[in-house]
Each structure stands twice: as C-alpha cells, then as structure tokens.
From Swiss-Prot:
GO CC field: 2-(3-amino-3-carboxypropyl)histidine synthase complex; cytoplasm
Entry keyword Transferase: yes
Biased composition regions of type Polar residues, renumbered to the chain: 35-44
Superkingdom per UniProt: Eukaryota
Entry cofactors: [4Fe-4S] cluster
Swiss-Prot/TrEMBL keywords: Cytoplasm, Iron, Iron-sulfur, Metal-binding, S-adenosyl-L-methionine, Transferase
Reactions catalysed according to its record: L-histidyl-[translation elongation factor 2] + S-adenosyl-L-methionine = 2-[(3S)-amino-3-carboxypropyl]-L-histidyl-[translation elongation factor 2] + S-methyl-5'-thioadenosine + H(+)
Keyword S-adenosyl-L-methionine: yes
Gene3D superfamilies named among the record's database cross-references: Diphthamide synthesis DPH1/DPH2 domain 1, Diphthamide synthesis DPH1/DPH2 domain 2, Diphthamide synthesis DPH1/DPH2 domain 3
Name listed for the protein in its UniProt record: 2-(3-amino-3-carboxypropyl)histidine synthase subunit 1
Sections of the chain in a coiled coil: none
Pfam families: Diphthamide_syn (PF01866)
Compartments, as annotated in UniProt: Cytoplasm
Amino acid sequence: MEEDRRQTDLGTAADIEEAQLAQASPSPAIENETESAAQTQNGATPLKQPKKRFVGRRAATEAAAKNGSSGATGESGAVATAKPRRAPRLLNQVPKEILENPDLKAAISLLPANYNFEIPKTIHRIQTSGSKRVALQMPEGLLLFATTISDILTQFCPGIETLIMGDVTYGACCIDDYTARALGCDLLVHYAHSCLIPVDVTTIKTLYVFVDISIDATHLLASLEHNFASGKTIAVVGTIQFNATIHGVKSSLERGGFRVLVPQIAPLSKGEILGCTSPRLTEDDKIDLILYLGDGRFHLESIMIHNPTIPAYRYDPYSRKLTRETYGHEEMQSLRRTAIHSARSARKWGLILGALGRQGNPHTLGLIEKELKARGIPIVHLLLSEIFPGKLALMSDIECWVQVACPRLSIDWGYAFSRPLLTPYEALVALGEKKDWGDGVYPMDYYGKDGLGRTRPLQIAS
C-alpha cells in the first residue's frame, strides 16, 4: 500500500517528516570538524580517520579545493566521488501551464481555501490518461462541493463527462470501482480516504485524493499546553485529512516539552487510524494520553477499544474544543461474549458478504465457510449493501449471522439484532479457531497487515 501512496503523491506529511529529520540530524562533516577542534584544544593527537570510500560531490569538491587537486587521495580524503544524482522524477508531476492557469485558480477559489481537492493534479491525470467518463466518489460531508468540482473538471477538460456517485460512503473500504466500471467510467476519483484498496487492484484507473484540511494549529498547541504539563508522552492520531497537521505539529509539541509518538499500524500511514483498524500501544511506549485530531468519535473509538487503559482526548478542529472521551469497555465486551456464546449452539448460520463498495472480502467469507462446512453446519449466503435488523429478522430460521462487511456494525449495533451478529474474528472464536481476548484487549486490526480484512486465497487453503 505504501507503494500505492507514493504513486498517488503522498503529500505534505512525508515532506514535513523529512525536513524535520534533516534539521534534527547534524551534518557528519560538522561533527568531525567539532571533534577535531576539541582534540586540538586539549593537546591530544587527533586519531587517524578511516578512508571515506564514497562521499557526496559537494564534499569531494571542497576537499579537492583545500588540497589543490582534482581528486583527494590523502589518508582521510575521499578516494572516489559519487556520480551525479539524476534529477528527481516526480510521479504525476503537474505541468506549470495547469498549476499557473489564472482561470483555473479563479475556479478553485470557489472551493474552501483550507480544503485541498488537488484539482490541478486531477485535471492532469484526466488529460494524461485520456479518460472520457470520470466518476467522482466522496463521503456525504463533501457532497455539497461535488457539483462545483464537476463543473471545474468539465470546463478544463473539454470532452469529458463526470458522474457523481451519490451512494453512502462510510470509509475507504466503500470505494466503488465495480459500480463505476458498470456505468462505463474509465477513471474513478475517490475523495477523503486513503488508498486502502490498492490502485493495481481496482478494476478501473483510480485516483485517491486525501483532501488535506488545514487547521489553526496555534490554537491546538495552546490548548494542549494549557491542559497538560510538559513532559507528558502523547500518542497523536487522526483521519487521513489531518495527517499532514499531525506531522506538522509534532516538532512544535516537542519544543513545548512534550514527548510525541505518531504510532502506525502497517500498512496504514503513520498516525492514520480507521474505525476498525488502529495501532496497539505497548507498555514500552509509556504513553500518558492519546490525542485524536478530527471530528466525531467513530475513528477515535477504534484506538480506545484497542488501548482501553490509556486516557483519550479529542481535539475537534471545527469547534476548536479539546474534550476527554470515555468508552464502555466492559459493557461492549460483555455483549460480544454473549453473542459468541449464543453462536456456539446455533444449528444454522447465515454468511453476509457486504456489497457496499469493497467492504466484503470473499476470501474472508470463504475462510469462515470452510470451517462451517468442516463441522457440517448448514449455511445460507446473503449479499447485502447495508445490513438492518428488520431484514435479517425475516429469515428466522437462521440462528447466527456472520457479516463480512464492517466489524463496527456488530460492535456498535449487534445488540439491536434478534440473532447473534458476529464479526469474522468473533465467528472464528466461536468455532474455536481463534483465541478469545480473555481479560485482555479486544483486537482492532481488521485492515492491519495480518488482519482478517486482508485474507487471501492461500490462507483459506492452509
């Protein structure tokens, strides 16, 4: 997935991290000069330095100028200079005629200035790919900008047709390349989510636009400094829209006396969490608190479930409020254990494959189906885009349901169903194929590297 992120232009977060690393790391040449000077002042004979087999061109040129020769061959000089580094080649580099187009800039000004919809990059992608019918998919919170974006793209890409996909989009798992292809589209632009489904897996050409949102970081820093004593260790996480801000404020918080950790659950980006996937923070990290940057609680609850003993706080960049958040861990775990216990005595199971975008993984479904067949348990298959209690209640002969769609549907709403509604993990626990979490932590790693959301055919066979 990290390769996919590079192909879709990772953006400012990586640039900020690299710049901070460069500032924090002193040059080796400066370190050597400082050490030599200190030894000379103390009257000590400087130690013979090992030969530098390969050095950068700039360092080699400086050494040659000092020695009055074109190639340094002394005891501590360079014996070879590095070849000139080729100019960096940027993928999806947008031409100046697009970036500096005054008419395009005027059109983009109709959109919120702090929302980066990457319009120039999208136009360039449409032009270079030769796309004629472009699907635009975004969460409901951004749909009010959809027609404006559509108008801009059709104006600056003559001859194309845009199609706004209006079905609900809960997250990155809902990317709907299947429907876009069925509607004759040859490019899908998916907004506000990371590339959970790789671009080499989608059935049509796909462009992910993260929609970086700029916020007032000064107020965030002031709020933290006012409420927490310096020296605290903070784990900072958020949704992909605020990922650049997370990396941007890290150095400022560290200057304020805080120790900052930006955790990662691979293959997601550092600091990024999903409603079903978040990093597990260890005791060695010595985290004092979790800070979530974003609105709403859905994503925050994921890391709270996965780290029940660490206090969690939410900074809402829209209301500019910092709040302490809590979660009913005991109640949730009790409800899920009850559902698992009931499922063990079920005589007929129903397997639901989620059809909302890419939510349903057929290989995960196949893994559970294999275990049920091995035990001789009758199965009914159901394909649903959205799962409601009333619909499942119509099939009263099914005594247990397993939904391969969104784990949070069972965790948040499982109590509303008349029959147990299990996640894939819970189903495997009920069948004795996975261990119960016991007195420990309920896992939230569905789209992690080894999560059940990433089940492959090989895992079913084994």
